[in-house]
């Protein structure tokens, strides 16, 4: 067969036919042919070659010491020692190398006494160190020589994989033979490669199937490694490269059955093992590597089990390790955890699971005995495809691993049979190397079946199970994923393993990866290969000196005195040379994360970043190379990657550069990972070696780049203090690292027995610690601490905590180690969090404890070692804490610890590529990936499971100034005085920002009013507790579900109603409606007492400071004088309430604006939402009617101080039954000359008479909040205007007189009584009051009485008021002359505004007015103003800003409020809607059942009950009404303290229930704000466009940006804006598939611009769908618009009909019979007046919406310029087509559009209709009437389709009597005088006017279908309904579904003239019910029926 050498390789490869078995250490290892590897890594090889100086990409430096694990798992010492050029190799062959070989051979031979096959630790023998390290010529092909990856790795050393090392196929000799510990590992032959003096295994032990594949695996349980995608073709020539040639067959050692079990662990191993067991090693050698070997049955793939399970070994500390990704091997069943503490168990493991046994038996026959095997010449056997696939990438050394494992396990002396060793080790599931774990449970080498948690993501999760193997056993070197454990069996060192931290303790050095040329002197003759973590073959191939092995010269702290090779335990990770094996640092220090782990510890399946138990977490191989096909990827790459760039993968917690590994760890790694490191660039390796040697005070002269194969011989006794880890990281498995490790191992020898014993303990410890450490590693990224040791020592490994005893030992060791480390870097190494758990197995307590307590003197070279030896990582697992300064963990950065301290980064391109592929920039560890299943693919590659991609979430671009103001508003920061100029600039900037947002709010409200109707504030009944429960129920679900849940709760726990309430329900109430939706009830208005810092020095024309100073305390007489007015109010209320007919209210509209606040000069700027203000000489003031009790409060605002007038006359009782319904004297109302001005007497007799200039005074338009919208005087005034204040006026118990106290400047409080004008349903007649004028607006819709009567009654009422007011003429006269400026008192109480917004207001020339209440007058009403000053805000917060009070302390707030205000009795308007006491006593399940339909019911039930329990506990009862009187900030803090309420929920309660200034941002608001461009976003990824966003910024961040800009708006504007926004989000701007083409805001919308640009540029123009302007004719039924100058927002028709009285013109004719006037057209609305069009148009006319095409064009152009890369000229082309008729985007066709909604024609029932007898009386403020839906003849309640004809009655002339017969029933009903119908109830009336959050759950035009009449329709005589107007009702499952896909006109029509209905309602139980099928049959049910 052709030689497998690559043409580029300058060294000889062994042809297959010549690849007989090589005799190594007395054992014959058959050459297992390897499937040719893909050339993926060729480039990398080339790079490596270049770096290494070998054009072939692989250097054949065969120095014995330099030998590193070959791809096959053989240590190619030469590869690592010095990758020499061909010339050097040749020279070495011819000269020194050969001599070195012979010397090393002699030394090794001299070691023949070493019997422990598991501990081939090389002792410092007389053998020449150089030869060991020296590069053997390829001719010699010396196994001992650096077993270069002769042909295996095409990629080069950098590509060298752990798998390759472990892959038995590629190993020319079995790992066991390498490990077998004769004094001389190799026998020098005169011909061919040296042969081992002794078999590494017990010849008497039966051969195992895995024997063939156990080459390198024997020490490690093989875990199917994740194949590296890069290394598909690497394996092909590996064996050839490794073994130069050997014409002689090497007798194949017979492997023990125990080894067979080891082979079971991997499919490849099993396959090869079986083949070898068949005696087909020769066949294997004959196999053509270029051909795919014959695949074994797919069953074998099962052997790629990710977990190594040790049965019977319970985890000592069950942990939830971050699970590693599981490798799923097709056809390979998961192995069951095996308990193999005993040999018997091991035996069971030998065969693996029963299935594996069957497979193996069927596949191959076991050789009779080992001897036979050894005698047999290797024959090439065809491997199964599976095997080929496995070794292809995943398990290069699997097949041989089994053999090597078995061989390794066996003592060279035969003292311990391999099977015995395996038994001792404990059966591992064989994930990595069953044999390894089985090698010797006693050795503890068997990794606990737990794979190291650190294992890379590629590693199967089963590694964790692997821990099971070792549980009972002390896993010597167990990487979580690595199941292979390489018990170094050679010598039975008697020192306790526990003390031994590393087998290979380089006395002076930590073993980084001192492979290759490093430490030529460190030939570990007896060294046993360190455990190669990951996919690597065992790092320690016995043939080469292993750093893992303690150098012979080095004395172990324990019985290390025997320089016998120490068996590597996980515990005995490579202890630093300083550390005696007995030293506490021993095993734990050795523990290294595989990624950054010492290579010696790398286990085959272990992913980089994984830790071997004994290893200290360095760079976790796992994290390093999760994606590598073999799970190990290139060991050196992985290690190097992890080592050199541990920081590359932030997620890999245990990524500690290999440099961090302890020397011993390094040595182990060197042994274990030497092969893997071989791939690393030689140059990096060389530099590493150099650093190491320098640290040791001698420099390795060999440079890979130069091709110097030999290093200068170093004194064997001298240890290299190489910063192996750092360098190793750089070298990434470079030879240098290997040599270092080797040199270190030379100095350390361990007794196999002791190591085994310790390993067992360690393994036990590791079983728990591995998982823990891995978890910890994941949780805490291993921090890189670069130790600047003079020697460039690698950073210390993370300290692992052991038992206290362990800690003591470790402390000692670490102390020594730390010394050196500390020299370079005094700063202590960062320790991983205690949570981290080291994989390092605890050293056996029995031996180690004593040792721990004892300080072990460092070896001779300890000082050197200390310099660079890291202390073991500190993990919760290992309790031992390193003592001394050396605590720096190897976690340190991968920087080399060499004197330069630089990290050599000479990586091949392949390595760089690999590292980049594995680069992870996330902040979190990829725990999910580690837990993920990895799919097995036919090519053998293991691909990590890709978790769901997280959808990108954009972030709001918030500037610092916004954050500052937000903090002030939230009370989180104090205002600091700054530069005045800067402050002024900021103030101007904020003014501009707020002006822009006022405009946006006004524009949005106006436009939405045109479409969605009037949604201004209208108070609902309900308590504060109702709203808190309501916000609980509204979280995370749509409003219709939330409202139904509350209704269900109310039905299940109905409130206890008093008889009076029941009586009230049946009393016909007066309907008072006003466009402002304001119904003020003085009884409900609490008094607010607060100090308001107001701008001072606010001079008003005509009011000088002197006049202000004249203010004095007023006497109480002023209040008494107001009594007459109070009486008149009561009389008027009685008269109005006596009316039995509903009527439209007379509205006294304030001059203030309806919409948002604006600047003082912006009155005409945004007229759409504001009423026109009339300024009359004096003051302009407007009064508006209020709630049913008709009491209203007037906000006195402006530059004039109110005066109190007195009068004592009684008001005549006037009959006002129908007065309010009249429309008389509108002109008079409008032309009132005088405004009612209320003054405040300075004292009983004196009145201040200073006249003031005109000012605008705004009447309150909200029940409890006075909106002072503009107190700028004639354009002058505060820098901010339209401040809203919310004085709350409570009627005193004895007197209904609101009292207000003002403190002006520093004067004493002034008292004035805010006058209350009795408001009636009709307009107040003009009242002539000298000196003042007030404009009163009234709008009345159709009434049942003629206008003349109305005018007469209005006149009569006017006289009444005139009389009333004339009685106090004198007072009023004085008042007119004593106008006072109360502007200062009108500041908003909330810091909504100026203060926070304008921090400089404190310095302004405004005078501070403090509003205080007299504590003695608790019963009297007071006005509290919302402060805007930052100072006041801070005062209000008090200590609340510091933090939330304990719940028990909140009652003090209630007491303060009630103490100041007095406990207010609850009235009918704030009563609870639910019996909360019953809920509190109910069980959680009962509450949960009531709200089950909503979802999340269990959690909410708990929260609701906890909330009720809390308020009862804190306050003694369920009552939070006191929050209405509490300061807004304190109320906010209190609500936030409730569990389950967030900022959005609290803001909802405050705005909608407490009527504070707040603006909640829910999902609808946030989404709209982003799409409209109101909130700036940080740049989005190029691939993501705005219209493709699925996630939006966090709501709180949106609120953080919006609130500082909206905080100056008044409460009414905020309410309407919020209500319109949430409705807009449900109707148009839905989360998915928004109705952009019908959206009236699309002209300004960024979302639409993005979608439009994308669609227009990528798709053909859609069909022209013009958004026709609304041309719906106005029905003749409606009255023409009434020209009321002050009325801006006439009510739509449905409101006019709310009274139940049809219009005069149409009350006699059905609407259907009147033809529409086609000729009538809406008045064309120009662009300028679009926003206020509806103010002056017919209230019944639907306004026209016109798209602002210019604005759209600008928005589109801006979007395209910013976000799209267009060619020159594309922009103009793209915008050419912009036209209103084409401004649409393609939309997906809606499915089941016919099922989204169902339209029904219904009749409108007046309130007095006979059908409503017995029904609840309609609520006064309910805009919707009762409706009647008529059934189609033959229709049933559940009929979803029109009834079908069921008889032929028509033909016969006779009708059937079948109720379901459509035809007959239609004829019958047509002839009958009755029809069937279902009642529809207005939602507000159905809920009796009480609902949480002010009823915003519902639409203003929402109805409920009466459930009873839905099931059994009522019979209605036709003559009852024939003349009623008709309406359209849309039925559906939700508001969103009803409006989906409708055009703008259709949506407009629904809101203006139609109604929506989404649920039924059962009146008796008051519970919600689903709609019956006849009303609406949803598509979801239709689908179910079909199925």
Curated annotation (Swiss-Prot):
GO biological process, one term: base-excision repair
InterPro entries referenced in this protein's UniProt entry, alphabetically: DME/ROS1 (IPR044811), DNA_glycosylase (IPR011257), Endonuclease3_FeS-loop_motif (IPR003651), HhH-GPD_domain (IPR003265), HhH_base_excis_C (IPR023170), Perm-CXXC (IPR028924), RRM_DME (IPR028925)
Tissue: Mainly expressed in immature flower buds, then decreases as the flower matures. Expressed in the ovule carpels, but not expressed in pollen stamens. Expressed in developing and mature ovules (stages 12-14), then strongly decreases after fertilization.
Bias-annotated ranges (Basic residues): 844-855
Cofactor: how and how many bound: Binds 1 [4Fe-4S] cluster. The cluster does not appear to play a role in catalysis, but is probably involved in the proper positioning of the enzyme along the DNA strand.
Signal sequence coordinates: none
Residue numbers spanned by region DEMETER: 955-1054
Keywords from the UniProt entry: 4Fe-4S, Activator, DNA-binding, Hydrolase, Iron, Iron-sulfur, Metal-binding, Nucleus, Transcription, Transcription regulation
Binding locations of [4Fe-4S] cluster: 1629, 1636, 1639, 1645
Listed SMART domains: ENDO3c, FES
Region (Disordered): 246-378, 392-415, 793-901, 1324-1351, 1439-1471
Function field: Transcriptional activator involved in gene imprinting. Catalyzes the release of 5-methylcytosine (5-meC) from DNA by a glycosylase/lyase mechanism. Allows the expression of the maternal copy of the imprinted MEA gene before fertilization, possibly by antagonizing or suppressing DNA methylation on target promoter. Probably acts by nicking the MEA promoter. Required for stable reproducible patterns of floral and vegetative development.
Entry comment, domain topic: The DEMETER domain, which is present in proteins of the subfamily, is related to the J-domain, but lacks some important conserved residues.
Family: Belongs to the DNA glycosylase family. DEMETER subfamily.
Misc. remarks from the entry: Although strongly related to DNA glycosylase proteins, it differs from these proteins because of its large size and its unique N-terminal basic domain. The DNA repair function has not been proved and may not exist.
Name of protein: Transcriptional activator DEMETER
Source organism per UniProt: Arabidopsis thaliana
């Amino acid at each position: 067969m052709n030689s497998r050498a690559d043409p580029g390789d300058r060294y000889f490869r062994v042809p297959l036919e010549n690849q007989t078995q090589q005799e190594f250490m007395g054992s014959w290892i058959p050459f297992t042919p390897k499937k040719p590897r893909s050339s993926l890594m060729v480039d990398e090889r080339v790079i490596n070659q270049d770096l290494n100086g070998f054009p072939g990409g692989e250097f054949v430096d065969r120095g014995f010491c330099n030998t590193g694990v070959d791809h096959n798992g053989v240590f190619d010492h030469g590869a690592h020692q010095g990758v020499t050029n061909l010339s050097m190799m040749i020279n070495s062959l011819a000269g020194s190398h050969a001599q070195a070989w012979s010397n090393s051979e002699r030394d090794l031979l001299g070691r023949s006494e070493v019997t422990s096959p598991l501990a081939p630790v090389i002792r410092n023998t007389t053998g020449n160190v150089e030869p060991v390290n020296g590069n053997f010529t390829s001719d010699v092909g010396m196994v001992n020589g650096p077993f270069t990856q002769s042909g295996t790795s095409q990629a080069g050393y950098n590509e060298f994989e752990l798998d390759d090392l472990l892959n038995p196929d590629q190993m020319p000799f079995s790992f066991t033979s390498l490990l077998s510990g004769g004094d001389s590992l190799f026998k020098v032959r005169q011909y061919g490669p040296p042969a081992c003096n002794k078999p590494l295994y017990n010849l008497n032990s039966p051969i195992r199937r895995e024997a063939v594949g156990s080459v390198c695996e024997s020490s490690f349980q093989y875990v199917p490694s994740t194949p590296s995608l890069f290394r598909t073709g690497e394996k092909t020539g590996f064996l050839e490269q490794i073994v130069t040639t050997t014409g002689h067959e090497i007798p194949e050692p017979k492997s023990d059955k125990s080894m067979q079990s080891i082979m079971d662990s991997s499919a490849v191993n099993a396959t090869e093992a079986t083949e070898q067991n068949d005696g087909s090693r020769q066949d294997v050698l004959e196999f053509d590597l270029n051909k795919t070997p014959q695949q074994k049955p797919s069953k074998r793939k099962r052997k790629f089990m990710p977990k190594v399970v040790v049965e019977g070994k319970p985890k000592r500390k069950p942990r939830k390790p971050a699970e590693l990704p599981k490798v799923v091997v097709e056809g390979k069943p998961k192995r069951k955890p095996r308990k193999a503490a005993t040999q018997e168990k091991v035996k069971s493991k030998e065969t693996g699971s029963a299935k594996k046994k069957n497979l193996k038996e069927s596949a191959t026959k076991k050789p009779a005995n080992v001897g036979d095997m050894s005698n047999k010449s290797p024959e090439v056997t065809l491997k199964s495809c599976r095997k080929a696939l496995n070794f292809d990438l995943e398990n290069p050394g699997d097949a041989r691993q089994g053999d090597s494992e078995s061989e390794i396990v066996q003592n060279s002396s035969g003292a311990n049979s391999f099977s015995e060793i395996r038994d001792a080790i404990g059966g591992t599931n064989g994930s990595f190397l069953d044999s390894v774990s089985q090698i010797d449970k006693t050795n503890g080498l068997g990794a606990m079946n737990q794979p190291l948690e650190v294992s890379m993501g590629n590693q199967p999760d089963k590694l964790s199970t692997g821990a099971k193997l070792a549980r009972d056993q002390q896993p010597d070197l167990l990487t979580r994923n690595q199941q292979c454990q390489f018990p170094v069996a050679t010598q039975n060192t008697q020192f306790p393993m526990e003390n031994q931290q590393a087998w290979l303790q380089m006395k002076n050095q930590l073993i980084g990866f001192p492979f290759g040329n490093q430490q030529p002197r460190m030939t570990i003759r007896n060294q046993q290969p360190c455990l190669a973590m990951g996919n690597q073959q065992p790092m320690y191939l016995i043939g080469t000196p292993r750093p893992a092995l303690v150098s012979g010269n080095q004395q172990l702290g324990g019985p290390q005195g025997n320089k016998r090779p120490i068996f590597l335990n996980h515990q005995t990770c490579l202890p630093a040379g300083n550390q005696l094996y007995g030293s506490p640092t021993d095993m734990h220090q050795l523990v290294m994360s595989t990624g950054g782990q010492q290579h010696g510890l790398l286990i085959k399946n272990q992913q980089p970043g994984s830790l071997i138990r004994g290893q200290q977490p360095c760079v976790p191989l796992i994290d390093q190379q999760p994606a590598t096909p073999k799970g190990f990827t290139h060991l050196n790459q992985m290690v190097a990657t992890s080592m050199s760039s541990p920081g590359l993968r932030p997620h890999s917690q245990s990524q500690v550069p290999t440099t961090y590994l302890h020397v011993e760890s390094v040595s182990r790694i060197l042994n274990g990972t030497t092969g893997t490191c071989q791939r690393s660039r030689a140059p990096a390796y060389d530099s590493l070696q150099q650093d190491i040697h320098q640290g040791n005070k001698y420099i390795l002269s060999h440079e890979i780049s130069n091709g110097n194969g030999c290093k200068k011989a170093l004194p064997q006794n001298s240890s290299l203090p190489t910063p192996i880890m750092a360098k190793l990281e750089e070298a990434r498995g470079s030879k240098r690292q290997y040599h270092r490790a080797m040199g270190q191992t030379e100095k350390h020898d361990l007794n196999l027995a002791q190591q085994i014993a310790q390993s067992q303990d360690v393994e036990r410890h590791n079983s728990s610690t591995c998982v823990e450490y891995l978890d910890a590693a994941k949780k805490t990224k291993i921090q890189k601490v670069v130790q600047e040791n003079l020697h460039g020592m690698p950073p210390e490994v993370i300290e692992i905590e052991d038992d206290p005893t362990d800690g003591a030992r470790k402390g000692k060791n670490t102390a020594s180690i730390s010394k050196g480390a500390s020299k370079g870097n005094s700063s202590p190494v960062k320790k991983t969090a205690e949570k981290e758990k080291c994989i390092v197995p605890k050293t056996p307590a029995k031996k180690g404890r004593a040792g721990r307590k004892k300080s072990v003197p460092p070896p001779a070279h300890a000082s050197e070692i200390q310099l660079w030896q890291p202390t073991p990582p500190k993990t919760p697992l290992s309790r031992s804490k390193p003592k001394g300064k050396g605590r720096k963990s190897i976690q340190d950065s991968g920087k080399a610890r060499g004197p330069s301290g630089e990290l050599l980064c000479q990586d091949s391109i392949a390595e760089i590529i690999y590292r980049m592929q594995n680069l992870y920039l996330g902040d979190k560890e990829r725990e999910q990936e580690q837990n993920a299943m990895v799919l097995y693919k036919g090519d053998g590659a293991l691909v990590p499971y890709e978790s769901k991609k997280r959808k990108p979430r954009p972030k709001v671009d918030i500037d610092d100034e916004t954050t500052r103001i937000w903090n002030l508003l939230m009370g989180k920061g104090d205002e600091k005085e700054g530069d005045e100029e800067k402050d002024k600039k900021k103030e101007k900037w904020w003014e501009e920002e707020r002006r822009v947002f006022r405009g946006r709010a006004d524009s949005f409200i106006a436009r939405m009013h045109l479409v969605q109707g009037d949604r201004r504030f209208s108070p609902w009944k309900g308590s504060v507790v109702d709203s808190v429960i309501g916000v609980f129920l509204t979280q995370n679900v749509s409003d219709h579900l939330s409202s139904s849940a509350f209704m269900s709760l109310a039905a299940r726990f109905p409130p206890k109603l008093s008889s009076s309430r029941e009586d009230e329900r049946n009393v016909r109430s007066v309907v008072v409606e006003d466009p402002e939706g304001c119904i003020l009830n003085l009884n409900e208005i609490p008094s607010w007492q607060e100090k308001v810092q107001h701008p001072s020095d606010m001079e008003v024309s005509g009011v000088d400071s002197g006049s202000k100073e004249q203010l004095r305390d007023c006497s109480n007489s002023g209040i008494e004088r107001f009594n007459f007015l109070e009486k008149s109010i009561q009389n008027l209320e009685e008269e109005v309430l006596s009316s039995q007919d509903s009527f439209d209210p007379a509205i006294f509209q304030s001059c203030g604006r309806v919409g948002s606040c604006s600047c003082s000069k912006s009155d005409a700027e945004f007229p759409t939402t504001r009423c026109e203000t009339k300024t009359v000489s004096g003051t302009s003031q407007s009064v508006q009617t209020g709630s049913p009790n008709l009491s209203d409060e007037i906000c006195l605002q402006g530059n004039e101080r109110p005066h109190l007038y007195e009068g004592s006359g009684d008001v005549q009782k006037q009959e006002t039954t129908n007065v309010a319904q009249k429309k008389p004297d509108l002109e008079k109302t409008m032309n009132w000359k005088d405004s009612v001005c209320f003054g405040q007497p300075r004292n009983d007799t004196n009145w201040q008479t200073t006249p003031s200039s005109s000012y605008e005074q705004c009447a309150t338009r909200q029940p409890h909040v006075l909106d002072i919208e503009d107190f700028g005087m004639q354009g002058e005034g505060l820098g901010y205007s339209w401040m809203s204040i919310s004085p709350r006026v409570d009627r005193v118990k004895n007197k209904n007189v609101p009292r207000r106290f003002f403190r002006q400047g520093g004067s004493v409080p002034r008292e004035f009584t805010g006058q209350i004008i009795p408001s009636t349903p009709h307009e107040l007649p003009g009242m002539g009051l000298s000196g003042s004028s007030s404009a009163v607006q009234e709008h009345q819709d159709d009434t049942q009485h003629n206008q003349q009567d109305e005018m007469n009654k209005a006149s009569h009422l006017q006289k009444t008021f005139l009389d009333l007011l004339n009685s106090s003429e004198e007072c009023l006269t004085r008042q007119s002359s004593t106008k006072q400026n109360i502007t200062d008192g009108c500041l908003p109480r909330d810091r909504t505004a100026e203060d926070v917004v304008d921090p400089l207001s404190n310095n302004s020339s405004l005078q501070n007015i403090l509003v205080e209440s007299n504590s003695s007058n608790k019963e009297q009403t007071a006005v509290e103003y919302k402060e805007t000053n930052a100072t006041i805000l801070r005062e209000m917060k008090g200590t609340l800003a510091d933090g939330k009070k304990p719940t028990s302390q909140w009652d003090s707030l209630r007491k303060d409020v009630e103490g100041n205000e007095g406990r207010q009795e609850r009235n009918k308007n704030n009563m609870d809607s639910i019996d909360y006491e019953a809920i509190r006593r109910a069980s959680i399940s009962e509450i949960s059942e009531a709200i089950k339909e909503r979802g999340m019911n269990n959690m909410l039930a708990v929260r609701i009950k906890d909330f009720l329990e809390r308020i009862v506990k804190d306050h003694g009862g369920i009552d939070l009404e006191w929050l209405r009187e509490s300061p807004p900030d304190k109320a906010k803090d209190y609500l936030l303290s409730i569990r389950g309420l967030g900022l959005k929920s609290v803001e909802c309660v405050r705005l909608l229930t407490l009527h504070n200034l707040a603006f909640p941002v829910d999902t609808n608001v946030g989404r709209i704000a982003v799409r409209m461009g109101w909130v700036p976003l940080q740049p989005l990824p190029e691939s993501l466009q705005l219209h493709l966003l699925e996630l939006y910024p966090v709501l709180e961040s949106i609120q953080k940006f919006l609130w500082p800009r909206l905080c100056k708006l008044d409460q009414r504007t905020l309410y309407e804006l919020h209500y319109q926004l949430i409705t807009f989000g449900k109707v148009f701007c839905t989360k998915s598939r928004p109705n952009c083409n019908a959206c009236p805001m699309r002209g300004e919308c960024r979302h639409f611009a993005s979608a439009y640009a994308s669609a227009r540029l990528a798709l053909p123009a859609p069909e022209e769908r013009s958004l026709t302007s609304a041309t719906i004719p106005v029905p003749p039924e409606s009255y023409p618009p009434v020209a009321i100058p002050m009325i801006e927002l006439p009510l739509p028709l449905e409101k006019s009909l709310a009274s139940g009285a049809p219009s005069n013109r149409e009350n006699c004719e059905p609407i259907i019979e009147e033809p529409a006037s086609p000729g009538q057209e809406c008045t064309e609305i120009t662009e300028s007046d679009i926003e206020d069009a509806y103010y002056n148009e017919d209230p019944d006319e639907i306004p026209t919406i016109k798209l602002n095409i210019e604005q759209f064009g600008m928005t589109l152009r801006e979007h395209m310029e910013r976000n799209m890369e267009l060619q020159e000229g594309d922009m103009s082309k793209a915008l050419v087509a912009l036209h209103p008729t084409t401004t649409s985007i393609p939309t997906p066709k809606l499915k089941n559009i016919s099922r989204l909604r169902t339209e029904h024609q219904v009749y409108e029932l007046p309130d007095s209709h006979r059908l409503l007898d017995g029904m609840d009386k309609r609520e006064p403020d309910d805009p919707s009437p009762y409706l009647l839906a008529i059934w189609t003849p033959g229709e049933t309640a559940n009929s979803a389709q029109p009834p079908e004809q069921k008889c032929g009655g028509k033909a016969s002339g006779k009708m059937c009597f079948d109720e379901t017969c459509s035809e007959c029933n239609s004829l019958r009903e047509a002839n009958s005088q009755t029809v069937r119908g279902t009642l529809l109830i207005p939602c507000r009336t159905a809920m009796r006017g009480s609902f949480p959050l002010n009823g915003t759950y519902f639409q203003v035009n929402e109805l409920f279908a009466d459930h009873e009449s839905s099931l059994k329709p009522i019979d209605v005589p036709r003559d009852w309904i024939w003349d009623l107007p008709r309406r359209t009702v849309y039925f559906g499952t939700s508001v969103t579904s009803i409006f989906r896909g409708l055009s703008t006109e259709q949506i407009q029509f629904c809101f203006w003239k139609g109604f929506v209905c989404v649920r039924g309602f059962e009146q008796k139980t008051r519970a919600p019910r689903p709609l019956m099928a006849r009303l609406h049959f949803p598509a979801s049910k239709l689908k179910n029926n079909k199925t």
